[in-house]
């Protein structure tokens, strides 16, 4: 199956999403349930457009050493610095083709077979997190991502993830902006540095804070002892009028990049975008909506096709900019138009 075939198939299988040739957030702008953004629906398109305003510096006066796109992270080696982003409640947002267990297992196993890995989701229904942990166990590796619930529930979910073999865990702290979290008793949502530190210490495995958009926030995550951060605005789904992740990444990387792992998401769609993210200071990227489309359009074959496309594009970028390894990619490789 090719990427184009999976995309075409998804158009008859997926709800609330048009499986567009270019996943730029415009056609689905305010579609929630579905892949849309909050409020005016401008943040997801802004994420995408910000990457398009960064260009690559052609330079082939370099040793012809071949290209290595692999990365070592989470104590594992992966073929690409790319991971599928955590998405839960897929039946609600994307239609009934799969239940949560089926979708998450396909995603986790498909990503591992393709040489990468998935972050898995969470939600009000306990099934969402449990499905991710079950899929992680079957796939051999995934990163469970817990919502910023009240302390006792976070501890319970950390225990559950570790019992199923988690080697790292994340918290999408920006989910504080989701209505169901705001309404919970006891209170859930934003966390202090001290509360985050409790989670980090309790986990005892690398803990990643997802939803950091400022240098100030990155420094707080560092102070809490997080192993890494994910620069993310939740795909535009939690706060309208946010800047694009590409616009804030460099400053954050300058502040904490030598002290913790940095992953970024938001509008990354091609291997060229992956290259740009690494040049700005990220160690790896998360990609969300396109991987959902691939599951609905082609299951594990769709995941393999899209991942192969990303690898071919990233390889080409590296060859044509004189970068033999990911470590060679830096800001001298990009141009801001």
Where are these regions (language model features)?
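Conserved active-site-proximal phosphate/metal-binding subdomains
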Residues: 1-29, 217, 236-261, 268-337
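An N-cap/entry alpha-helix motif that binds or orients negatively charged groups
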Residues: 2-78
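Generic structural signal for well-ordered, non-membrane alpha-helical segments
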Residues: 37-40, 44, 100, 104, ...
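N-terminal functional module of multi-domain proteins
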Residues: 43-129
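Structural signal for hydrophobic packing residues in well-ordered secondary-structure cores
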Residues: 51-58, 111, 115, 162-165, ...
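Flexible, glycine/proline-enriched loop segments at strand-loop-helix junctions
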Residues: 94, 119-121, 142-149, 181-187
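Alpha/beta enzyme core
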Residues: 109, 137-138, 149-264, 271-294, ...
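Long, hydrophobic, well-ordered secondary-structure blocks that form the structural core
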Residues: 117, 128-152
């Amino acid at each position: 199956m090719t990427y184009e075939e999976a995309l075409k198939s998804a158009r008859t299988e997926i709800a609330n999403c048009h499986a567009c040739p270019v996943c730029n957030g415009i056609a689905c702008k305010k579609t929630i349930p579905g892949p849309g953004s909050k409020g005016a629906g401008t943040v997801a398109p802004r994420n995408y457009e910000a990457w398009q305003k960064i260009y690559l510096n052609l330079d082939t006066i370099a040793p012809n050493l071949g290209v290595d796109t692999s990365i070592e992270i989470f104590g594992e080696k992966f073929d690409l610095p790319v991971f599928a982003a955590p998405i839960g409640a897929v039946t609600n947002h994307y239609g009934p083709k799969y239940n949560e267990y089926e979708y998450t297992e396909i995603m986790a196993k498909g990503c591992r077979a393709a040489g990468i890995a998935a972050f898995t989701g969470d939600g009000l229904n306990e099934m969402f997190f449990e499905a991710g942990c079950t899929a992680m166990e079957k796939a051999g590796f995934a990163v469970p991502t817990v919502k910023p619930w009240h302390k006792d529930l976070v501890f319970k979910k950390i225990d559950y993830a570790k019992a199923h073999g988690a080697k790292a865990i994340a918290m999408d702290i920006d989910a504080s902006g989701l209505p169901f979290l705001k309404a919970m008793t006891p209170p859930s949502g934003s966390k202090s540095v001290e509360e985050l530190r409790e989670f980090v210490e309790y986990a005892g495995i690398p803990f990643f804070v997802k939803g950091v958009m400022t240098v100030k926030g990155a420094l707080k995550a560092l102070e809490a002892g997080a192993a890494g951060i994910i620069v993310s605005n939740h795909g535009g789904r939690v706060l309208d009028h946010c800047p694009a992740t590409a616009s804030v990444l460099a400053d954050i990387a300058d502040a904490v990049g030598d002290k913790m792992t940095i992953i970024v998401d938001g509008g990354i769609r091609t291997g060229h975008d992956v290259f740009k993210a690494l040049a700005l200071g990220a160690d790896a990227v998360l990609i969300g909506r396109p991987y959902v489309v691939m599951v609905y359009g082609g299951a594990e074959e769709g995941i393999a096709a899209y991942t192969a496309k990303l690898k071919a594009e990233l390889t080409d970028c590296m060859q044509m900019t004189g970068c033999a390894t990911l470590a060679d990619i830096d800001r001298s490789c990009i141009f801001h138009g």
